[in-house]
Every structure is written in C-alpha cells, then in structure tokens.
C-alpha cells in the first residue's frame, strides 16, 4: 500500500482522520516543510480560506509541493473541510488536484465519519493496485 502524506492544523481533524486509515503516514511539519519524500504518495489536506476563497491551501503545503521531488511523486489528493464554508468547501484539494494534474480521490467533512474511513480505505486499495 502507498504512503499518505498529510498536513493537519491545531484542530487535529485531518490527523484524526488519517490515523484511522491504517496506512503508512508522513506528516508535513510546519518547521520543516521542505523535507523530501522518496516514493509515490496521496496527499490529505484541509482547506483554510478567507471569506473569498483566498489562502485555501495551507502555506506549509505549498512549500512542500514547491519541492520538485515532492510534486513529482504526488499521485492523488484527499480533502478535508467544513461545509459551512459553502462553495469554498474542500477548495484546497480542488486547487492541488488541478495544479498537480492528479485526481481528487475523496472529500470529507471535519473529522470524517466511519463511512468516510471505510470508503477511503477501499478506494485507496483500488487506487494503489491500479498504479502498480
């Protein structure tokens, strides 16, 4: 199974979600965002946007993806967000998918549900098998 790279803020919603997936995890550290990964991965990222959709992708994630090696190895993105933000719900995953030319594999709200976890586990299993 592939690697999950994720960023989680102080709320811990994304970290909680990925911890339930039973996958190998690599957390993007705010203090060391330029660390390089050396294998294909799926990125799990929350959205942080102002009232107009600006700054949706966390800066630390932008710095991580600006590293050529990291950007080259991304295979898909999963987004976390809050539906209260309407059209900006999961905007970060949409932006990353578009800019990195990878599929947005799934979107979940807040910490996700048990159903979300099951869907993502099954989806990742199929996804990684397709890539091999």
UniProtKB/Swiss-Prot annotation:
The record ties this protein, via Pfam families, to: Flavodoxin_NdrI (PF07972)
- At the top level of its lineage, which domain of life is listed? Bacteria
GO biological process terms held by the UniProt record: protein modification process
> Which InterPro entries did the record assign?
Flavoprotein-like_sf, RNR_Ib_NrdI_bac, RNR_NrdI
* A single GO molecular function term of this UniProt record: FMN binding
Write out the similarity annotation. Belongs to the NrdI family.
What is the purpose of this protein?
A: Probably involved in ribonucleotide reductase function.
Name the UniProt record assigns to this protein: Protein NrdI
- What is the scientific name of the source organism? Bartonella quintana (strain Toulouse)
């Amino acid at each position: 199974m592939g690697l999950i790279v994720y960023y989680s803020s102080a709320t811990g919603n994304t970290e909680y979600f990925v911890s339930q997936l039973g996958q190998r995890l690599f957390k993007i550290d705010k203090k060391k965002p330029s660390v390089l990964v050396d294998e294909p991965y799926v990125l799990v990222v929350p959205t942080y946007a102002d009232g107009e959709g600006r700054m949706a992708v966390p800066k630390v994630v932008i710095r991580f993806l600006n590293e050529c090696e990291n950007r080259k190895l991304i295979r898909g993105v999963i987004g976390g967000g809050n539906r209260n933000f309407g059209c900006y719900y999961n905007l970060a995953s949409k932006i990353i998918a578009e800019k990195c030319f990878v599929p947005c594999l799934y979107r979940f709200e807040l910490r996700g549900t048990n159903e979300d976890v099951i869907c993502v586990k099954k989806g990742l299993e199929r996804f990684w098998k397709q890539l091999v």
